[in-house]
């Protein structure tokens, strides 16, 4: 059976040639559909903090004297995207033209040790959408999903304001799950950006004893309260350590989830957390972070846990967005056409108070 569906030969695409050279191409070649591939017409793509840090030249992406470059230019950025199936290879089964779908950011190999034991999000050789030229991302009119892509179907009536948040909310869910929250825990979430808000609305479903949110922007803290925070504090306006210790008989919080990528937030977490507490880190850092490891080991014997991507999270996120359990209203603050990508990247920095900025396609 031949390839089903058709697409034009060229498309609009934002292409990263280097950290200082991002260009909107108006006639970039569309992806070719192999026998195991699915091509979607992109509806929208969110701009992530990782996209910003990549464009700003963070060493973890472009390398430095210590580490090699990880990205593979020229590539099309964007991993928070979804779209409608417009073309499918002859071997593809279980999907139909016109269905709305999205996929995990990681493209696992399916063969390595981690993939075989079910930890596909930690795939050793893995590819990632939006950073490599053989897995181009969603800031283009068309995107190719390969055979090992982890695809999830979206309801036809799911609005952009929810569909564009499935990927970041999947990451939020995984981070909260790593914390293993119980109803006896005092939980602190540092950061009320998109990821932090996703963590707050999901953590509320865990019914912790108290859910405390920290952020330097008061408008984000107001939204955090609407999403389920019991208490909010601005570290720039109060002594967070004093406030949290006062609420916990001087012990500190049971769980601290770091969602800012700011070194000061890491140090803050090690201060406000109690002995034998659980510290979860989910952030991309733009620079090195130094902490006193004696706090982690000798003084507090902390349980330090990382959180990476959004494994097995999409079905839950999609269902609970649609039924209203996961709040999304107010997270997407700006929707712009791809032609205004420079404005979008600028606003995504939060300088005008924006949260999630999304690029939309016709």
Residues covered by each model-derived region:
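Glycine-rich cofactor phosphate-binding loops and adjacent beta1-alpha1 units
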Residues: 179-182, 206, 222, 226-303, ...
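Conserved acidic E/D residue at the C-terminus of a beta-strand in Rossmann-like folds
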Residues: 215, 283, 308
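NAD(P)H dinucleotide-binding glycine-rich loop of Rossmann-like/cofactor-binding domains
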Residues: 67-74, 79, 109-190
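C-terminal substrate-binding/catalytic core of Rossmann-like NAD(P)-dependent dehydrogenases/reductases
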Residues: 241-246, 286-334, 342-343, 349-354
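Short, well-ordered coil/turn residues at beta-beta hairpins
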Residues: 44, 104, 257-259, 361
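Glycine-rich beta-strand-centered segment in the early N-terminal region that forms part
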Residues: 31-45, 60-113, 155-157
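Mid-domain Rossmann-like dinucleotide-binding core that forms the NAD(H)/NADP(H) cofactor-binding site
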Residues: 141, 156-238, 242
């Amino acid at each position: 059976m031949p390839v089903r569906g058709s697409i034009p030969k060229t498309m609009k695409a934002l292409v990263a040639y280097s950290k200082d050279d991002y260009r909107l191409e108006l006639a970039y070649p569309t992806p070719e559909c192999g026998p195991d591939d699915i091509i979607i017409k992109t509806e929208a793509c969110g701009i992530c903090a990782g996209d910003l840090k990549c464009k700003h030249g963070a060493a973890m992406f472009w390398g430095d004297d210590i580490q090699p470059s990880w990205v593979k230019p020229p590539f099309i950025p964007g991993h928070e995207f979804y779209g409608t199936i417009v073309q499918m290879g002859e071997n593809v089964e279980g999907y139909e033209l016109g269905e709305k779908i999205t996929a995990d950011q990681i493209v696992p190999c399916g063969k390595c040790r981690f993939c075989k034991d079910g930890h596909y999000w930690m795939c050793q050789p893995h590819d990632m959408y939006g950073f490599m030229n053989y897995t181009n991302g969603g800031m283009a009119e068309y995107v190719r999903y390969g055979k090992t892509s982890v695809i999830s179907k979206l309801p036809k009536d799911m609005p952009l304001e929810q569909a564009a948040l499935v990927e970041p909310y999947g990451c939020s869910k995984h981070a909260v799950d790593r914390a293993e929250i119980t109803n006896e825990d005092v939980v602190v979430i540092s950061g009320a950006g998109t990821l932090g808000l996703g963590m707050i609305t999901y953590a509320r479903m865990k019914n912790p004893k108290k859910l405390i949110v920290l952020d330097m922007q008061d408008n984000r803290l107001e939204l955090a309260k609407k999403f389920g925070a019991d208490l909010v504090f601005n570290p720039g306006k109060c002594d967070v350590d004093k406030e949290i210790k006062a609420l916990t008989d001087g012990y500190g919080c049971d769980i601290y989830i770091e969602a800012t990528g700011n070194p000061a937030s890491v140090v803050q977490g090690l201060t406000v957390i109690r002995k034998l507490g659980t510290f979860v880190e989910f952030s991309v850092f733009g620079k090195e972070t130094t902490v006193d490891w004696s706090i982690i080991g000798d003084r507090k014997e902390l349980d330090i846990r990382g959180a990476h991507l959004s494994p097995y999270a999409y079905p839950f996120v999609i269902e609970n967005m649609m039924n209203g359990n996961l709040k999304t209203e107010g997270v997407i603050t700006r929707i712009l056409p791809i032609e205004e990508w420079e404005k979008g990247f600028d606003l995504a920095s939060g300088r005008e108070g924006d949260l999630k900025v999304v690029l939309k396609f016709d």
